[in-house]
UniProtKB/Swiss-Prot annotation:
Region Required for protein stabilization induced by IL1B, residue ranges: 1-21
Keyword annotations: Acetylation, Activator, Cytoplasm, Cytoskeleton, DNA-binding, Nucleus, Phosphoprotein, Transcription, Transcription regulation, Ubl conjugation
Keyword match Acetylation: yes
Protein name: Cyclic AMP-dependent transcription factor ATF-5
Residue ranges annotated for the bZIP domain, each copy included: 209-272
PTM sites of type N6-acetyllysine: 29
Coiled-coil zones: none
Stretches for region Disordered: 118-154, 168-241
Gene Ontology MF: a single term: DNA-binding transcription activator activity, RNA polymerase II-specific
Phenotype reported upon loss of the gene: The majority of pups die within 48h after birth even if there is no major phenotypic differences at birth. Mice reveal a lack of milk in their stomach and show a dramatic loss of mature olfactory sensory neurons.
Described purpose of this protein according to its UniProt entry: Transcription factor that either stimulates or represses gene transcription through binding of different DNA regulatory elements such as cAMP response element (CRE) (consensus: 5'-GTGACGT[AC][AG]-3'), ATF5-specific response element (ARE) (consensus: 5'-C[CT]TCT[CT]CCTT[AT]-3') but also the amino acid response element (AARE), present in many viral and cellular promoters. Critically involved, often in a cell type-dependent manner, in cell survival, proliferation, and differentiation. Its transcriptional activity is enhanced by CCND3 and slightly inhibited by CDK4.
Pfam families: bZIP_1 (PF00170)
Length: 283
C-alpha cells in the first residue's frame, strides 16, 4: 500500500466509532491489488525477498514501523479553542439610541423647511425663443422675354365689307360720289433681325490664331528685354573702358615725366664725373 492509502485508513479508524471497526478489520484481511509503482517507490516484499503485492510484512522491517505509527493531527485543528458548554456567547453591541436619532432627524427636517421658506420665490425661467427658420435658398427666376405688339395690316375681307357699307350708305341715286378706291395692301414688314447668339465654344481656327499671336507677342517682348539688357551691359562696359583709358593716359604721362627726370639726373652725373676727372688731370 502507498503512503496516502495508509494515511487514509488511519484517518478512517480515528474518525469512525468503535462499533463500526468490525467491517474495517475484515476489509484489511482481503488481498489488495498491487498499486502502481512510482519512479521512486518499491514494494516492501520485493526488498525483503517476498513477492510483490502478497504476504504480510516481516516484523521489524522498514515499512512496519512507520505504517503502524500513530500520527497526532491536533496541529491541524483551528487555533481558537471551542467554548465550553456552560459559557454564554459574548454580548452583542448595544443598538443605537432611537430617540436620539429621531431628534436629530427632526432637527434636520426643520432646518431644511426654514431654508425653503426663507428662499425668495423666483419666477421660472422663460424658455429661449425658437430660432428663426432658415431661409430657403432662392433661385433666380428667368426674366420674361419682351413681347413686341406689331400693328397687323387690315385684311382684304375687312376692306371689301367697308366698301359695300359705304356704297349702301350713299344710296343708288347719288351718282356724284365716286367709289372709294381700294386701299393698297402695305408691303409686309421685314422680320426683325434676331440677336446673334454667341458661339458656345471658340472655333479651333480662331484659337490657333490667338495662340500664334500670343506666342508672337511673347517673343517680341523677350527680344525687347534681351536688347535692352545687352544695351545696358554695353553702356556699362563702354563707361568702364573709358575710365580705364583715362587712367592709362595719366599713368603714361607720369611715367614719361619720371623717365625725363631720370635722364636729367644721369646727364648731371656724367657732367660731374667729367668735371672731376678734368680737375684731377690738371692737378
Amino acid at each position: 500500500m502507498s503512503l496516502l492509502a495508509t494515511l487514509g485508513l488511519e484517518l478512517d479508524r480515528a474518525l469512525l466509532p468503535a462499533s463500526g471497526l468490525g467491517w474495517l478489520v475484515d476489509y484489511g484481511k482481503l488481498p489488495l491489488a498491487p498499486a502502481p509503482l512510482g519512479p521512486y517507490e518499491v514494494l516492501g516484499g520485493a526488498l525483503e525477498g517476498g513477492l510483490p503485492g502478497g504476504g504480510e510484512p516481516l516484523a521489524g522491517d522498514g515499512f512496519s514501523d512507520w505504517m503502524t505509527e500513530r500520527v497526532d493531527f491536533t496541529a491541524l485543528l483551528p487555533l481558537e479553542a471551542p467554548l465550553p458548554p456552560g459559557t454564554l456567547p459574548p454580548p452583542s453591541p448595544a443598538p443605537p439610541d432611537l430617540e436620539a436619532m429621531a431628534s436629530l432627524l427632526k432637527k434636520e427636517l426643520e432646518q431644511m423647511e426654514d431654508f425653503f421658506l426663507d428662499a425668495p420665490l423666483l419666477p421660472p425661467p422663460s424658455p429661449p425663443p425658437p430660432p428663426p427658420p432658415a431661409a430657403a435658398p432662392s433661385l433666380p427666376l428667368p426674366l420674361p422675354l419682351p413681347t413686341f405688339d406689331l400693328p397687323q395690316p387690315p385684311t382684304l375681307d375687312t376692306l371689301d365689307l367697308l366698301a359695300v357699307y359705304c356704297r349702301s350708305e350713299a344710296g343708288p341715286g347719288d351718282s356724284g360720289l365716286s367709289t372709294l378706291p381700294v386701299p393698297q395692301q402695305p408691303p409686309p414688314l421685314a422680320p426683325l433681325p434676331s440677336p446673334a447668339r454667341p458661339a458656345p465654344y471658340p472655333s479651333p481656327a480662331s484659337t490657333r490664331g490667338d495662340r500664334k499671336q500670343k506666342k508672337r507677342d511673347q517673343n517680341k517682348s523677350a527680344a525687347l528685354r534681351y536688347r535692352q539688357r545687352k544695351r545696358a551691359e554695353g553702356e556699362a562696359l563702354e563707361g568702364e573702358c573709358q575710365g580705364l583709358e583715362a587712367r592709362n593716359r595719366e599713368l603714361r604721362e607720369r611715367a614719361e615725366s619720371v623717365e625725363r627726370e631720370i635722364q636729367y639726373v644721369k646727364d648731371l652725373l656724367i657732367e660731374v664725373y667729367k668735371a672731376r676727372s678734368q680737375r684731377t688731370r690738371s692737378t
